[in-house]
Amino acid sequence: MLRLIGVGCLALSAIMTSCNDTDDNPEYREAAVTNLVTYVGMTDGAVFDYISIDDATPARLYTGVQMDGNVVAGQRYLMTYIPVGGDESASGFVEPTSLAAVTTMDVSDKDISRYPDWDKSGVYLLSAWRAGSYLNIRCKLAFSESPRVLALVPSAEDEGVLYLVHQAPADATFDRVYYISFDLTRYLSEHQSLDAIEVHINNTNLKENVLTFLL
């Protein structure tokens, strides 16, 4: 059973402004972005990688943030910061103005035959995209402090076919926005011939229930 980490209603790559005027132009404000990043370790401060989409070159982001010793490499975060030189693809030192842990999971080692009612609870899908080895989901789910079943589960028969299993607790009430990152590394290493994955989802938003992601 899983307890989701909620991050509120931050919009991915939402443009915000800082309060730093430049000497040359007091009207100028540097644009900040909010992106999903991957914690890779510590070098004086926490270091993160950012991949925008698909197989874009990672931007290595160095910060002065001191992380809890229990945080492991691969944990995903939603980070707001001003990009290096205003370029999101550039590596260098950044100063996060917010940093929120995001639910991060591997593909399940069970198969979908274990979940005959895999689509019992709907997922209001807002967006889904692959960034490197991560499949990212931004969605609305009914809020509850009770554990729920949420997993990306492979088909028992069809290679490259996965199911987003969601079974919400009975006391779930109002909807809340969540980001979820699934690490595909292990699954793809076991299925190296794939050129795409197909994800089935009980999507209560646009009724697009099968999503295809090229690899």
Predicted features and spans:
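Bacterial N-terminal signal peptides that target proteins for export
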Residues: M1-G6
